[in-house]
Amino acid sequence: MKIKVKLPDGKEKEYDRGITPAEIAKELGVKKAIGAVVNGELWDLKRPIENDCELRLVTLEDPEAPEFYRHTMAHILAQAVMRIYGKENVKLGIGPTIENGFYYDFDIKNGRLTEEDLPKIEQEMKKIIKENLPIERKEISKEEARKLFNNQPYKLELIEEIEGDRVTIYRQGEFVDLCRGPHLPSTGIVKHFKLLSVSGAYWRGSEKNPMLTRVYGTAFAKKEDLDNYLKFLEEAQRRDHRKLGPHLELFMLNTEYAPGMPFFLPKGVVVLNELMKFSRELHRERGYQEIFTPLIMNEQLWKISGHWDHYAENMYFIEKDEERYAVKPMNCPGHILVYKSRTVSYRDLPLRFFEFGRVHRYERSGVLHGLMRVRSFTQDDAHIFCTPGQIEEEILGVLDLINTIYSQFGFTYRVELSTMPEDHMGDEAIWEKATTALKNALERAGLSYKVNEGEGAFYGPKIDFHIRDSIGREWQCATIQLDFMMPEKFNVTYIGPDNKEHRAVMIHRAIYGSLERFFGILIEHFAGAFPTWLAPIQVAVIPISEKHNDGAEKIAKRISQEGFRVFFDNRRETLGYRIRQAQTQKIPYMIILGDKELESGKISVRTRTGKEIKDVDLEHFVETLRNEVLSRKLELLMEG
């Protein structure tokens, strides 16, 4: 029987059913093929093709290649661990690819791996790569699989959850794994890898299950790419907010008494207040009204909103006076109650409510991560209530606000628009009109965007913003979400020109997203060296010796009186130590004062990067500092 295969150049060819991409690659002269994409699915090079399809061969240069070779590298890792520790002593978990790498989970009898074990595992992996073992894909019955993995309890659990009667296994040498693939044709194709770290991970992510040992690694087709990535990881580690935050006395975490709930220290609160002050100024200019809604509200509210049915496992509850209350996981129901507290006319719209609302959401302890993944956080939440005809202009206004805020921190960003899914609620005509309004606003704002067809929430289309930090990482922060569900559930209406009730449109939006998470991103973006307007301490005044203390203190007070955050460092430490301390604390400016400065009335200024500016008039410095802070400059003006 023949099948038709359509190639990327549009040509169709007929082949015998069961032909493999490897045979097609040989015919086409593509010697470097490592796999294929068949009807959009990643496909092993030696896997037979049974039906008509579109086919594109994959080489190591293609964007799909890492999925093949990193998946194979995860199997090489597992094979190496079983060789070293003994097949009978190692129970295998799962070993998927992840962004920029892979991992494998192990349950090892009589002990756990540590990072000290990684070099010997790498050496064994190199041997397996050198052996260049052929990798064979095979479909077997579940009964055969149960016998094959009879000493692998985690694999047996996975087998029972797979639909159908057959499963896929992969074999390389003596190693066999339950796996969907895809994989390389053999173990020797990609040689450039590095094992990165070891951590604990509960089986299936549940604290009720055994703790396994997770080994992370990465792999690249080219050594140069691997080396560059390892340098990137070093830089990311240097910027890690979990290290910098406590070092700079910005925040602390207490996993014993408040897991996932950060404590912000005085210096951190300064930064948070500056972020909120900046945001409030912009919101006031744009006609937003700030409100504050209760942290705890009756269960009936959450039943109406749907959170009770669909989100209860992520919520915290309180029972008092035979009434049940929930700590709010979201701000929107509270904003709706404010809207509904009076009759709203079409003349009142749009109404823009804004809140720095503290919310609580339960997250498993295993996924908590510094400020990035927490259980208690503050959202810069706003809800816009408007008529259908006002959607486009309101979205345009939000886009401008987002751009203004992100530009202030030096962020670039990319935009994604997610449209109506199959399981949507509401009339399709309303969806189409709303989606068109979002597209028009994006185009009027001059923003390029990617469309994710059918990936919107069931209650409305949305726009997501992914900001890029100073080392190129992306973070999803701002969201603009149209909501057709909440106005229905809460009967959110306005009185129209016809004196009748009409359904209002509700737009959710957040820009920082989580204030805590945004703070963490900023710490890493600036490597702790905040621009002066954000810096917890803006100026350190350092007398050279005790005899200069009085004069230095007067200068410190003069600068402080102008509203700047000043640290007068007259500690009985060496001058060099105090300067180094100011630099490690990332203080933008240091004023060094000795005999010469106090006699001349001129100051010596040193920036945190080490640049020295001598004979500076104090009033000139104050004025420069004022301009730098008021205009929220990213750079230090005294370095210009």
Swiss-Prot record:
Ranges where the TGS domain occurs: 1-59
EC number(s) from the headed UniProt entry: 6.1.1.3
Origin superkingdom: Bacteria
SMART domains for this protein: tRNA_SAD (SM00863)
Named cofactor requirement(s): Zn(2+)
Catalytic reaction(s) noted: tRNA(Thr) + L-threonine + ATP = L-threonyl-tRNA(Thr) + AMP + diphosphate + H(+)
Pfam families in UniProt: HGTP_anticodon, TGS, tRNA-synt_2b, tRNA_SAD
Principal subcellular localisation of the protein: cytoplasm
Subcellular location per the Swiss-Prot or TrEMBL entry: Cytoplasm
Keyword annotations: Aminoacyl-tRNA synthetase, ATP-binding, Cytoplasm, Ligase, Metal-binding, Nucleotide-binding, Protein biosynthesis, RNA-binding, tRNA-binding, Zinc
Binding-site residues, Zn(2+): C332, H383, H508
Cofactor binding, note field: Binds 1 zinc ion per subunit.
SUPFAM superfamilies: Class II aaRS ABD-related, Class II aaRS and biotin synthetases, TGS-like, ThrRS/AlaRS common domain
One GO term describing the cellular component: cytoplasm
Membrane-spanning intervals of the chain: none
Residue span of region Catalytic: 240-531
GO BP field: threonyl-tRNA aminoacylation
Molecular-function GO terms, alphabetical: ATP binding; metal ion binding; threonine-tRNA ligase activity; tRNA binding
Stored InterPro entries: aa-tRNA-synt_IIb, aa-tRNA-synth_II, aa-tRNA-synth_II/BPL/LPL, Anticodon-bd, Anticodon-bd_dom_sf, Beta-grasp_dom_sf, TGS, TGS-like
Function field: Catalyzes the attachment of threonine to tRNA(Thr) in a two-step reaction: L-threonine is first activated by ATP to form Thr-AMP and then transferred to the acceptor end of tRNA(Thr). Also edits incorrectly charged L-seryl-tRNA(Thr).
Family (UniProt): Belongs to the class-II aminoacyl-tRNA synthetase family.
Oligomer status and interactors: Homodimer.
NCBIfam families: thrS
Protein name: Threonine--tRNA ligase
Organism: Thermotoga sp. (strain RQ2)
Gene: thrS
